[in-house]
Amino acid sequence: MKTLYSLRRSYPVETLFNGTLALGGRDQATTGFAWWSGNARLINLSGKLLGAHVAHAGLIVFWAGAMNLFEVAHFVPEKPMYEQGLILLPHLATLGWGVGPGGEVVDTFPYFVSGVLHLISSAVLGFGGVYHALIGPETLEESFPFFGYVWKDKNKMTTILGIHLILLGAGAFLLVFKALYFGGLYDTWAPGGGDVRKITNITLNPGVIFGYLLKSPFGGEGWIVSVDNLEDIVGGHVWLGSICILGGIWHILTKPFAWARRAFVWSGEAYLSYSLAAISVMGFIACCFVWFNNTAYPSEFYGPTGPEASQAQAFTFLVRDQRLGANVGSAQGPTGLGKYLMRSPTGEIIFGGETMRFWDLRAPWLEPLRGPNGLDLGKLKKDIQPWQERRSAEYMTHAPLGSLNSVGGVATEINAVNYVSPRSWLSTSHFVLGFFFFVGHLWHAGRARAAAAGFEKGIDRDTEPVLFMNPLN
Protein backbone atom coordinates (compact mmCIF):
# COMPACT_ATOMS: atom_id res chain seq x y z
CA MET A 1 0.00 0.00 0.00
CA LYS A 2 1.27 3.46 -0.90
CA THR A 3 2.39 5.63 2.01
CA LEU A 4 0.48 8.91 2.02
CA TYR A 5 2.72 10.70 4.51
CA SER A 6 6.39 11.35 4.98
CA LEU A 7 8.29 8.69 6.92
CA ARG A 8 10.46 11.54 8.22
CA ARG A 9 7.56 13.28 9.89
CA SER A 10 9.01 12.79 13.38
CA TYR A 11 12.46 14.09 12.54
CA PRO A 12 13.42 17.47 14.03
CA VAL A 13 12.98 20.52 11.80
CA GLU A 14 16.38 21.40 10.38
CA THR A 15 16.15 25.19 10.68
CA LEU A 16 18.43 26.53 13.41
CA PHE A 17 16.37 27.01 16.54
CA ASN A 18 16.89 28.28 20.01
CA GLY A 19 15.73 25.15 21.85
CA THR A 20 14.82 26.84 25.11
CA LEU A 21 12.52 29.75 25.91
CA ALA A 22 14.99 31.02 28.54
CA LEU A 23 16.58 34.34 27.66
CA GLY A 24 20.14 33.19 28.27
CA GLY A 25 23.07 35.25 27.03
CA ARG A 26 21.18 38.49 27.45
CA ASP A 27 22.71 39.55 30.77
CA GLN A 28 25.26 42.26 31.43
CA ALA A 29 28.18 39.88 31.74
CA THR A 30 27.55 38.53 28.23
CA THR A 31 26.54 41.67 26.36
CA GLY A 32 28.07 44.55 28.30
CA PHE A 33 24.62 46.11 28.71
CA ALA A 34 22.17 45.93 31.64
CA TRP A 35 18.53 44.91 31.08
CA TRP A 36 17.33 48.50 30.87
CA SER A 37 19.52 49.11 27.82
CA GLY A 38 16.92 47.13 25.89
CA ASN A 39 17.90 46.31 22.33
CA ALA A 40 21.56 47.18 22.95
CA ARG A 41 21.84 43.66 24.40
CA LEU A 42 20.90 42.30 20.97
CA ILE A 43 23.49 44.22 18.93
CA ASN A 44 25.19 41.04 17.74
CA LEU A 45 22.10 38.78 17.76
CA SER A 46 20.46 39.57 14.43
CA GLY A 47 17.64 37.05 14.91
CA LYS A 48 16.64 38.43 18.31
CA LEU A 49 16.95 42.02 17.12
CA LEU A 50 14.62 41.14 14.25
CA GLY A 51 12.11 39.89 16.84
CA ALA A 52 12.35 43.15 18.79
CA HIS A 53 11.83 45.22 15.63
CA VAL A 54 8.88 43.18 14.38
CA ALA A 55 7.23 43.26 17.82
CA HIS A 56 7.78 47.02 17.97
CA ALA A 57 6.11 47.40 14.57
CA GLY A 58 3.24 45.28 15.90
CA LEU A 59 2.78 47.63 18.88
CA ILE A 60 2.72 50.66 16.58
CA VAL A 61 0.17 49.10 14.23
CA PHE A 62 -1.89 47.86 17.20
CA TRP A 63 -2.08 51.41 18.56
CA ALA A 64 -3.16 52.69 15.14
CA GLY A 65 -5.92 50.08 14.83
CA ALA A 66 -7.17 50.36 18.41
CA MET A 67 -7.15 54.17 18.40
CA ASN A 68 -8.84 54.15 14.99
CA LEU A 69 -11.70 51.98 16.31
CA PHE A 70 -11.88 54.06 19.51
CA GLU A 71 -12.37 57.22 17.42
CA VAL A 72 -14.99 55.51 15.22
CA ALA A 73 -16.89 54.37 18.32
CA HIS A 74 -16.92 57.91 19.76
CA PHE A 75 -17.54 59.75 16.49
CA VAL A 76 -20.60 62.04 16.34
CA PRO A 77 -21.48 62.87 12.70
CA GLU A 78 -23.28 66.09 13.65
CA LYS A 79 -20.12 67.73 15.05
CA PRO A 80 -16.96 68.63 13.11
CA MET A 81 -14.03 66.26 13.58
CA TYR A 82 -11.83 68.92 15.13
CA GLU A 83 -14.34 69.45 17.94
CA GLN A 84 -14.14 65.77 18.97
CA GLY A 85 -10.44 65.41 19.75
CA LEU A 86 -9.84 63.12 16.76
CA ILE A 87 -6.33 62.73 15.34
CA LEU A 88 -6.65 59.64 13.10
CA LEU A 89 -10.02 60.05 11.37
CA PRO A 90 -8.96 63.45 9.95
CA HIS A 91 -6.11 61.68 8.14
CA LEU A 92 -8.48 59.09 6.66
CA ALA A 93 -10.94 61.82 5.67
CA THR A 94 -8.16 63.79 3.98
CA LEU A 95 -7.44 60.70 1.87
CA GLY A 96 -11.02 60.88 0.61
CA TRP A 97 -12.47 58.01 2.64
CA GLY A 98 -16.06 58.40 3.82
CA VAL A 99 -16.51 62.13 3.10
CA GLY A 100 -18.52 64.18 0.63
CA PRO A 101 -18.99 67.85 -0.30
CA GLY A 102 -17.89 70.34 2.34
CA GLY A 103 -16.03 67.63 4.25
CA GLU A 104 -19.27 66.13 5.58
CA VAL A 105 -18.80 62.54 6.76
CA VAL A 106 -21.25 60.38 4.79
CA ASP A 107 -19.95 56.89 5.68
CA THR A 108 -17.93 55.71 8.69
CA PHE A 109 -17.57 52.12 7.43
CA PRO A 110 -14.20 52.78 5.69
CA TYR A 111 -12.86 54.02 9.04
CA PHE A 112 -14.04 50.82 10.74
CA VAL A 113 -12.38 48.71 8.01
CA SER A 114 -9.12 50.64 8.46
CA GLY A 115 -9.11 49.96 12.19
CA VAL A 116 -9.84 46.25 11.78
CA LEU A 117 -7.16 45.81 9.09
CA HIS A 118 -4.59 47.44 11.36
CA LEU A 119 -5.60 45.23 14.29
CA ILE A 120 -5.35 42.05 12.20
CA SER A 121 -1.95 43.00 10.78
CA SER A 122 -0.73 43.92 14.27
CA ALA A 123 -1.58 40.38 15.41
CA VAL A 124 0.52 38.93 12.57
CA LEU A 125 3.41 41.24 13.44
CA GLY A 126 3.03 40.47 17.14
CA PHE A 127 3.20 36.73 16.48
CA GLY A 128 6.28 37.20 14.31
CA GLY A 129 7.92 39.34 16.97
CA VAL A 130 7.31 36.81 19.76
CA TYR A 131 8.46 33.96 17.49
CA HIS A 132 11.75 35.61 16.57
CA ALA A 133 12.35 36.89 20.11
CA LEU A 134 11.82 33.52 21.83
CA ILE A 135 11.98 30.60 19.38
CA GLY A 136 13.72 31.57 16.14
CA PRO A 137 17.50 31.42 15.58
CA GLU A 138 19.57 33.87 17.61
CA THR A 139 21.51 34.92 14.52
CA LEU A 140 20.41 34.89 10.89
CA GLU A 141 23.82 34.82 9.22
CA GLU A 142 24.17 31.02 9.13
CA SER A 143 20.64 29.92 8.24
CA PHE A 144 19.34 32.93 6.27
CA PRO A 145 22.40 34.74 4.90
CA PHE A 146 20.29 37.17 2.84
CA PHE A 147 18.72 38.50 6.05
CA GLY A 148 21.90 38.25 8.12
CA TYR A 149 24.36 41.11 8.51
CA VAL A 150 27.43 42.34 10.33
CA TRP A 151 27.31 46.00 11.35
CA LYS A 152 30.75 46.76 9.91
CA ASP A 153 29.93 45.19 6.52
CA LYS A 154 29.62 48.46 4.61
CA ASN A 155 28.31 46.83 1.43
CA LYS A 156 25.56 44.94 3.29
CA MET A 157 24.57 48.09 5.18
CA THR A 158 24.07 50.10 1.98
CA THR A 159 22.08 47.19 0.53
CA ILE A 160 19.76 47.33 3.56
CA LEU A 161 19.56 51.12 3.10
CA GLY A 162 18.56 50.54 -0.53
CA ILE A 163 15.78 48.14 0.43
CA HIS A 164 14.43 50.69 2.92
CA LEU A 165 14.50 53.45 0.28
CA ILE A 166 12.56 51.29 -2.20
CA LEU A 167 9.89 50.60 0.44
CA LEU A 168 9.63 54.33 1.25
CA GLY A 169 9.30 55.11 -2.46
CA ALA A 170 6.55 52.53 -2.82
CA GLY A 171 4.76 54.18 0.11
CA ALA A 172 4.94 57.57 -1.62
CA PHE A 173 3.42 56.03 -4.76
CA LEU A 174 0.51 54.62 -2.72
CA LEU A 175 -0.69 58.21 -2.22
CA VAL A 176 -0.23 58.87 -5.95
CA PHE A 177 -2.33 55.81 -6.88
CA LYS A 178 -5.03 56.81 -4.36
CA ALA A 179 -5.17 60.29 -5.88
CA LEU A 180 -5.17 59.10 -9.51
CA TYR A 181 -7.13 55.84 -9.55
CA PHE A 182 -8.74 54.95 -6.22
CA GLY A 183 -11.33 57.65 -5.59
CA GLY A 184 -9.08 60.68 -5.29
CA LEU A 185 -8.32 62.90 -2.30
CA TYR A 186 -10.28 65.51 -0.36
CA ASP A 187 -9.57 68.92 -1.91
CA THR A 188 -10.40 71.78 0.43
CA TRP A 189 -10.10 74.19 -2.54
CA ALA A 190 -12.83 72.53 -4.64
CA PRO A 191 -15.55 75.07 -5.59
CA GLY A 192 -18.33 75.61 -3.08
CA GLY A 193 -16.39 74.61 0.02
CA GLY A 194 -14.37 71.46 -0.71
CA ASP A 195 -15.02 67.98 -2.13
CA VAL A 196 -13.36 64.66 -2.98
CA ARG A 197 -11.88 64.60 -6.48
CA LYS A 198 -9.38 62.64 -8.55
CA ILE A 199 -6.13 64.54 -9.05
CA THR A 200 -5.51 64.04 -12.78
CA ASN A 201 -3.38 67.03 -13.83
CA ILE A 202 -0.48 66.41 -11.44
CA THR A 203 2.54 68.74 -11.44
CA LEU A 204 5.69 67.02 -12.74
CA ASN A 205 7.64 70.17 -13.66
CA PRO A 206 10.88 69.90 -11.63
CA GLY A 207 11.18 73.69 -11.56
CA VAL A 208 7.90 73.90 -9.62
CA ILE A 209 8.48 70.89 -7.35
CA PHE A 210 12.09 71.66 -6.41
CA GLY A 211 11.33 75.39 -6.37
CA TYR A 212 9.60 74.81 -3.03
CA LEU A 213 12.90 73.60 -1.55
CA LEU A 214 14.63 76.81 -2.65
CA LYS A 215 12.02 79.12 -1.09
CA SER A 216 12.78 81.01 2.10
CA PRO A 217 11.25 79.38 5.20
CA PHE A 218 10.16 82.80 6.54
CA GLY A 219 7.03 84.89 6.07
CA GLY A 220 4.87 84.45 3.00
CA GLU A 221 7.53 82.32 1.26
CA GLY A 222 7.04 79.40 3.62
CA TRP A 223 9.42 76.81 2.05
CA ILE A 224 7.63 73.49 1.25
CA VAL A 225 4.98 74.29 3.87
CA SER A 226 3.57 76.90 1.46
CA VAL A 227 2.18 74.29 -0.98
CA ASP A 228 -1.47 75.20 -1.64
CA ASN A 229 -2.76 72.71 -4.22
CA LEU A 230 -3.08 68.93 -4.46
CA GLU A 231 -1.53 68.82 -7.94
CA ASP A 232 1.81 69.93 -6.49
CA ILE A 233 1.48 67.63 -3.46
CA VAL A 234 0.79 64.54 -5.57
CA GLY A 235 3.46 65.55 -8.10
CA GLY A 236 5.92 65.91 -5.24
CA HIS A 237 5.12 62.35 -4.20
CA VAL A 238 5.80 61.13 -7.76
CA TRP A 239 9.22 62.79 -7.67
CA LEU A 240 9.96 61.64 -4.13
CA GLY A 241 8.85 58.06 -4.82
CA SER A 242 10.92 57.92 -8.01
CA ILE A 243 14.03 59.32 -6.33
CA CYS A 244 13.70 56.92 -3.38
CA ILE A 245 13.24 53.86 -5.63
CA LEU A 246 16.10 54.82 -7.98
CA GLY A 247 18.29 55.64 -4.98
CA GLY A 248 17.40 52.30 -3.43
CA ILE A 249 18.38 50.41 -6.59
CA TRP A 250 21.62 52.42 -6.72
CA HIS A 251 22.52 51.55 -3.12
CA ILE A 252 21.75 47.86 -3.65
CA LEU A 253 23.88 47.59 -6.81
CA THR A 254 26.87 49.69 -5.71
CA LYS A 255 29.44 49.68 -2.94
CA PRO A 256 30.07 52.82 -0.87
CA PHE A 257 32.72 55.16 -2.30
CA ALA A 258 36.01 55.63 -0.47
CA TRP A 259 35.05 59.11 0.78
CA ALA A 260 31.81 57.69 2.26
CA ARG A 261 33.69 54.84 3.94
CA ARG A 262 36.01 57.38 5.54
CA ALA A 263 33.37 59.98 6.43
CA PHE A 264 30.86 57.79 8.28
CA VAL A 265 31.09 55.73 11.43
CA TRP A 266 30.02 52.17 10.55
CA SER A 267 28.41 50.65 13.65
CA GLY A 268 24.94 49.79 14.91
CA GLU A 269 24.86 52.79 17.24
CA ALA A 270 25.98 55.12 14.44
CA TYR A 271 23.13 53.92 12.21
CA LEU A 272 20.74 54.47 15.11
CA SER A 273 21.99 58.05 15.46
CA TYR A 274 21.58 58.73 11.71
CA SER A 275 18.01 57.40 11.87
CA LEU A 276 17.19 59.53 14.91
CA ALA A 277 18.51 62.66 13.15
CA ALA A 278 16.37 61.94 10.07
CA ILE A 279 13.19 61.31 12.05
CA SER A 280 13.87 64.43 14.15
CA VAL A 281 13.95 66.57 10.99
CA MET A 282 10.71 64.89 9.84
CA GLY A 283 9.09 65.68 13.20
CA PHE A 284 10.00 69.38 12.99
CA ILE A 285 8.77 69.63 9.38
CA ALA A 286 5.50 67.87 10.30
CA CYS A 287 5.07 70.33 13.18
CA CYS A 288 5.25 73.32 10.82
CA PHE A 289 3.15 71.61 8.14
CA VAL A 290 0.21 70.76 10.40
CA TRP A 291 0.31 74.18 12.08
CA PHE A 292 0.36 76.37 8.96
CA ASN A 293 -0.86 74.32 5.99
CA ASN A 294 -4.60 74.03 5.33
CA THR A 295 -4.30 72.10 2.03
CA ALA A 296 -2.51 68.93 3.15
CA TYR A 297 -4.33 69.31 6.50
CA PRO A 298 -7.79 70.66 5.57
CA SER A 299 -9.40 72.93 8.15
CA GLU A 300 -12.70 71.03 7.76
CA PHE A 301 -11.07 68.11 9.62
CA TYR A 302 -8.21 69.61 11.64
CA GLY A 303 -9.78 72.94 12.53
CA PRO A 304 -8.58 76.34 11.29
CA THR A 305 -4.98 77.49 11.41
CA GLY A 306 -4.17 80.35 13.80
CA PRO A 307 -4.10 82.99 11.04
CA GLU A 308 -7.27 81.50 9.55
CA ALA A 309 -9.23 81.80 12.81
CA SER A 310 -8.06 85.38 13.23
CA GLN A 311 -9.02 86.38 9.68
CA ALA A 312 -12.35 84.57 10.13
CA GLN A 313 -13.11 86.77 13.14
CA ALA A 314 -12.46 89.96 11.15
CA PHE A 315 -14.58 88.64 8.28
CA THR A 316 -17.47 87.65 10.58
CA PHE A 317 -17.66 91.11 12.16
CA LEU A 318 -17.35 92.78 8.76
CA VAL A 319 -20.38 90.77 7.58
CA ARG A 320 -22.35 91.65 10.73
CA ASP A 321 -21.61 95.38 10.69
CA GLN A 322 -22.16 95.66 6.95
CA ARG A 323 -25.68 94.26 7.50
CA LEU A 324 -26.18 96.91 10.19
CA GLY A 325 -25.35 99.64 7.69
CA ALA A 326 -21.62 100.24 8.19
CA ASN A 327 -19.60 101.39 5.19
CA VAL A 328 -16.81 98.85 5.51
CA GLY A 329 -14.72 100.54 2.83
CA SER A 330 -14.24 103.84 4.66
CA ALA A 331 -14.91 103.22 8.38
CA GLN A 332 -11.93 104.11 10.58
CA GLY A 333 -10.83 102.33 13.73
CA PRO A 334 -9.57 104.00 16.94
CA THR A 335 -6.04 104.33 15.53
CA GLY A 336 -7.15 106.08 12.34
CA LEU A 337 -6.40 102.98 10.27
CA GLY A 338 -9.23 101.21 8.49
CA LYS A 339 -11.55 99.47 10.94
CA TYR A 340 -12.54 96.68 8.54
CA LEU A 341 -10.20 97.07 5.57
CA MET A 342 -6.74 98.56 5.06
CA ARG A 343 -3.65 98.25 2.87
CA SER A 344 -0.94 95.62 3.23
CA PRO A 345 2.78 96.55 3.00
CA THR A 346 2.64 95.68 -0.70
CA GLY A 347 -0.57 97.56 -1.41
CA GLU A 348 -3.27 94.89 -1.41
CA ILE A 349 -6.56 95.49 0.39
CA ILE A 350 -6.57 93.34 3.56
CA PHE A 351 -8.63 93.00 6.75
CA GLY A 352 -7.93 95.75 9.28
CA GLY A 353 -7.42 95.54 13.01
CA GLU A 354 -5.24 93.10 14.91
CA THR A 355 -5.55 90.47 12.19
CA MET A 356 -3.49 92.65 9.81
CA ARG A 357 -0.41 90.61 10.82
CA PHE A 358 -2.00 87.59 9.12
CA TRP A 359 -2.66 89.51 5.91
CA ASP A 360 -1.05 86.87 3.65
CA LEU A 361 -3.36 84.05 4.78
CA ARG A 362 -4.89 82.01 1.96
CA ALA A 363 -8.05 80.01 2.73
CA PRO A 364 -10.71 78.43 0.49
CA TRP A 365 -13.61 80.35 2.09
CA LEU A 366 -11.87 83.71 1.56
CA GLU A 367 -10.12 83.48 -1.83
CA PRO A 368 -13.33 83.88 -3.93
CA LEU A 369 -13.65 87.40 -2.48
CA ARG A 370 -10.26 88.57 -3.71
CA GLY A 371 -9.52 90.52 -6.88
CA PRO A 372 -6.27 91.56 -8.55
CA ASN A 373 -5.56 94.07 -5.74
CA GLY A 374 -6.45 92.00 -2.69
CA LEU A 375 -9.93 91.86 -1.17
CA ASP A 376 -12.49 93.18 -3.67
CA LEU A 377 -14.84 95.75 -2.13
CA GLY A 378 -17.54 94.99 -4.69
CA LYS A 379 -17.43 91.26 -3.90
CA LEU A 380 -17.50 91.95 -0.16
CA LYS A 381 -20.67 94.00 -0.65
CA LYS A 382 -22.51 91.70 -3.08
CA ASP A 383 -20.96 88.22 -3.40
CA ILE A 384 -20.57 86.80 0.12
CA GLN A 385 -22.20 83.33 0.19
CA PRO A 386 -23.96 81.79 3.22
CA TRP A 387 -21.44 78.90 3.37
CA GLN A 388 -18.60 81.42 3.70
CA GLU A 389 -20.36 83.14 6.60
CA ARG A 390 -21.09 79.83 8.35
CA ARG A 391 -17.57 78.54 7.93
CA SER A 392 -15.85 81.72 9.11
CA ALA A 393 -18.11 81.93 12.19
CA GLU A 394 -17.26 78.31 12.99
CA TYR A 395 -13.52 78.87 12.49
CA MET A 396 -13.57 82.11 14.50
CA THR A 397 -14.68 80.18 17.59
CA HIS A 398 -12.25 77.29 17.12
CA ALA A 399 -8.84 78.93 17.02
CA PRO A 400 -5.95 76.52 17.69
CA LEU A 401 -4.79 79.05 20.30
CA GLY A 402 -7.92 79.36 22.41
CA SER A 403 -8.85 82.42 24.42
CA LEU A 404 -11.36 83.60 27.00
CA ASN A 405 -14.11 84.43 24.49
CA SER A 406 -13.43 81.37 22.31
CA VAL A 407 -11.94 83.53 19.57
CA GLY A 408 -8.26 83.78 18.61
CA GLY A 409 -6.06 84.67 21.56
CA VAL A 410 -2.86 83.59 23.24
CA ALA A 411 -1.98 80.14 24.51
CA THR A 412 -2.01 81.12 28.19
CA GLU A 413 -5.72 81.97 28.22
CA ILE A 414 -8.50 79.48 28.92
CA ASN A 415 -10.91 78.54 26.14
CA ALA A 416 -14.62 78.83 26.94
CA VAL A 417 -15.67 75.76 24.91
CA ASN A 418 -13.14 73.32 26.42
CA TYR A 419 -11.62 72.82 23.01
CA VAL A 420 -8.20 71.52 22.02
CA SER A 421 -7.52 71.83 18.31
CA PRO A 422 -6.02 68.75 16.62
CA ARG A 423 -3.61 71.24 15.01
CA SER A 424 -2.36 72.28 18.46
CA TRP A 425 -2.10 68.67 19.56
CA LEU A 426 -0.37 67.31 16.46
CA SER A 427 2.04 70.22 15.99
CA THR A 428 3.03 70.28 19.67
CA SER A 429 3.47 66.51 19.89
CA HIS A 430 5.60 66.44 16.73
CA PHE A 431 7.75 69.32 17.97
CA VAL A 432 8.34 67.57 21.31
CA LEU A 433 9.05 64.23 19.61
CA GLY A 434 11.34 65.93 17.09
CA PHE A 435 13.25 67.59 19.92
CA PHE A 436 13.73 64.40 21.91
CA PHE A 437 14.73 62.43 18.82
CA PHE A 438 17.33 65.14 18.18
CA VAL A 439 18.67 64.79 21.73
CA GLY A 440 18.77 61.01 21.17
CA HIS A 441 20.70 61.62 17.95
CA LEU A 442 23.32 63.71 19.79
CA TRP A 443 23.65 61.10 22.54
CA HIS A 444 24.05 58.08 20.27
CA ALA A 445 26.21 59.94 17.72
CA GLY A 446 28.57 60.99 20.51
CA ARG A 447 28.79 57.44 21.84
CA ALA A 448 29.29 55.99 18.35
CA ARG A 449 32.09 58.44 17.54
CA ALA A 450 33.73 57.80 20.91
CA ALA A 451 33.56 54.03 20.42
CA ALA A 452 35.07 54.39 16.95
CA ALA A 453 37.90 56.44 18.48
CA GLY A 454 38.55 53.75 21.07
CA PHE A 455 36.94 55.04 24.26
CA GLU A 456 33.43 55.17 25.70
CA LYS A 457 31.23 58.15 26.51
CA GLY A 458 28.13 57.96 28.67
CA ILE A 459 27.21 56.75 32.14
CA ASP A 460 30.07 55.23 34.14
CA ARG A 461 29.35 51.50 34.24
CA ASP A 462 31.15 51.07 37.57
CA THR A 463 28.91 53.44 39.51
CA GLU A 464 25.58 53.34 37.70
CA PRO A 465 22.69 52.77 40.17
CA VAL A 466 21.18 49.85 38.28
CA LEU A 467 24.15 47.65 39.23
CA PHE A 468 22.93 47.72 42.83
CA MET A 469 19.35 46.73 41.97
CA ASN A 470 18.10 43.15 41.98
CA PRO A 471 17.98 41.43 38.56
CA LEU A 472 14.54 41.33 36.93
CA ASN A 473 14.45 37.53 37.10
From Swiss-Prot:
It comes from the Eukaryota. Binds multiple chlorophylls and provides some of the ligands for the Ca-4Mn-5O cluster of the oxygen-evolving complex. It may also provide a ligand for a Cl- that is required for oxygen evolution. PSII binds additional chlorophylls, carotenoids and specific lipids. [CaMn4O5] cluster binds at E367. The modification Phosphothreonine is found at T15. Keywords: Acetylation, Chlorophyll, Chloroplast, Chromophore, Manganese, Membrane, Metal-binding, Phosphoprotein, Photosynthesis, Photosystem II, Plastid, Thylakoid, Transmembrane, Transmembrane helix. One of its GO terms (biological process) is photosynthetic electron transport in photosystem II. The chain crosses the membrane at residues 69-93, 134-155, 178-200, 255-275, 291-312, 447-471. The modification N-acetylthreonine is found at T15. The keyword Chloroplast applies. InterPro entries: PS_antenna-like (IPR000932), PS_II_antenna-like_sf (IPR036001), PSII_PsbC (IPR005869), PSII_PsbC_sf (IPR044900). GO terms for molecular function: chlorophyll binding; electron transporter, transferring electrons within the cyclic electron transport pathway of photosynthesis activity; metal ion binding. It is found in: Plastid, Chloroplast thylakoid membrane. Gene3D superfamilies: photosystem ii from thermosynechococcus elongatus (1.10.10.670). The keyword Lipid biosynthesis does not apply. One of the components of the core complex of photosystem II (PSII). It binds chlorophyll and helps catalyze the primary light-induced photochemical processes of PSII. PSII is a light-driven water:plastoquinone oxidoreductase, using light energy to abstract electrons from H(2)O, generating O(2) and a proton gradient subsequently used for ATP formation. Belongs to the PsbB/PsbC family. PsbC subfamily. PSII is composed of 1 copy each of membrane proteins PsbA, PsbB, PsbC, PsbD, PsbE, PsbF, PsbH, PsbI, PsbJ, PsbK, PsbL, PsbM, PsbT, PsbX, PsbY, PsbZ, Psb30/Ycf12, at least 3 peripheral proteins of the oxygen-evolving complex and a large number of cofactors. It forms dimeric complexes. HAMAP family: PSII_PsbC_CP43. This is Photosystem II CP43 reaction center protein. It comes from Zygnema circumcarinatum. The gene is psbC.
